[in-house]
Amino acid sequence: MKRLTIYGLSLLLSILIPGIKKSFAQTMFDPFQLKVEAIPMNGMPAIHSFSWAKWENKWLLIGGRTNGLHGFQPPFAFPTANQNTNIYVIDPDSGMVWSISATTLPQQTREHITSSNQQFSQKDSFLYITGGYGYESNQNMLLTFPAITRVNVPEVITAIIQQQPLYGFFSTNIDERMAVTGGHMVNLNSTFYLVMGHRFDGRYNPHNGPSFTQTYTESIQSFIIDDSSGLPVIHQ
């Protein structure tokens, strides 16, 4: 199974990055060691399934959930009260943690970035977030957001540390093609790739009841993002 996984990764990388397959194959079985060490940090948020970016020596954490993955029987699956509505900045060197509420942002942006299992990719000073599963108030339901949000990473980090308003550092656009959750997004040479994932609308039911619809993408989307209008616009 391990070799199949590695070969699958090699194939995907060879598609996305021409010329990488040979060098990857030469090194994928080289011996290596991996050490994981826990570092205690006061104030570190207990969240999962969030998007993140890095600027200089600080981390930016957006979205995700504050509860574990349990209690999935409707109407208790994915309670909205456990969506992470704070945005965090972490300095791993000093151990400092800052946060600010996302509730002051416009509704469209706020609801999108507080979803979970979004796809995200950082390009220079901007973090791009697509899709994600969460509560949408206009339709009064849990769904996969057909949206893309651009985040000005250094400006947001500075605003959170200084406890200043976040307005003006986020821009959100609606695009049905971005209605994906649980996939992966990368950017290579100014082209973004949205890999796999699915669209899940409704409340989860472990018995496959009628409370949701689900469609797997089974695809890799490639596109560029045009920011010239002030909004992130997708061109495929």
Predicted regions and their residues:
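Surface-exposed loop and turn segments in beta-propeller and other repeat-based domains
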Residues: 37-40, 94-111, 155-176, 233-236
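Beta-strand-rich domains and repeat architectures in extracellular enzymes and scaffolds
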Residues: 38-72, 76-82
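Beta-propeller and closely related beta-sheet repeat lectin domains
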Residues: 48-52, 111-120, 181-185
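Beta-propeller blade signature
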Residues: 76-95, 142-159, 207-231
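Glycine-centered tight turns/hairpins at beta-strand boundaries that repeat
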Residues: 55-74, 129-139, 189-208
